[in-house]
UniProtKB/Swiss-Prot annotation:
Keyword Cytoplasm: no
First and last residue of the signal peptide: none
Domain of life: Archaea
SUBUNIT field: Part of the 30S ribosomal subunit.
GO BP: any one term: translation
Keywords: Ribonucleoprotein, Ribosomal protein
PROSITE patterns from the UniProt entry: RIBOSOMAL_S15 (PS00362)
Organism (species): Pyrococcus furiosus (strain ATCC 43587 / DSM 3638 / JCM 8422 / Vc1)
Region listing for Disordered, in residue ranges: 1-21
Biased composition (Basic residues): 1-18
Single GO molecular function: structural constituent of ribosome
Name this protein carries in UniProt: Small ribosomal subunit protein uS15
Membership in a protein family: Belongs to the universal ribosomal protein uS15 family.
GO cellular component term of the entry, any: cytosolic small ribosomal subunit
Length: 158
């Protein structure tokens, strides 16, 4: 499949092995995993970093291999665990990381206004932000009146 803002295909990467149940060597229960996720979030880690720590230090390859105790038809996710405990960020993390990139690029362009390649990169990043905002408004993760504004984005990122 082609990239979003390029006409070429990406490099192939490794594929996760197809599993429906946790491996035998995982000795943690669902409650222990939830407690670990909450503990790591309170220490200030992002959801991606929590997943990496669970994989590398605790031997849990993926939280999605475990069934959600509240709804057995769904699998657990780190975001659902954080929402259940009231620790989820108000702005979704992928959107926040894109906003952070845009703010840093704007800061660069203030010092180097003739950097046209970076200007184009900023346009592409802000297109992705607008696309994600539209999606999150439709899903109800963001309020309907939320708008991306570069000036208020500086205050969001800090």
């Amino acid at each position: 499949m082609a990239r979003m803002h390029a006409r070429k295909r990406g490099k192939s990467g490794s594929k996760r092995p197809p599993r429906t149940a946790p491996p035998i060597w995982v000795e943690y229960t669902v409650e222990e995993i939830e407690n670990l996720v909450v503990k790591l979030r309170k220490e200030g880690y992002s959801t991606a970093m929590i997943g990496t720590i669970l994989r590398d230090q605790y031997g849990i390859p993926s939280v999605k291999l475990f069934k959600d105790p509240d709804n057995p038809n769904r699998n657990l996710t780190i975001t659902r665990i954080l929402e259940k405990h009231g620790l989820a960020p108000e702005i979704p993390e992928d959107l926040m990381f894109l906003i952070r990139r845009a703010v840093n690029l704007r800061k660069h362009l203030e010092q180097h206004p003739k950097d046209l390649h970076s200007m184009r990169g900023l346009q592409l990043i802000e297109s992705k932000i607008r696309r994600l905002v539209k999606y999150y408004k439709r899903k109800g993760k963001l309020p309907k009146n939320w708008r991306y504004d570069p000036e208020t984005a500086k205050l969001l990122v800090r």
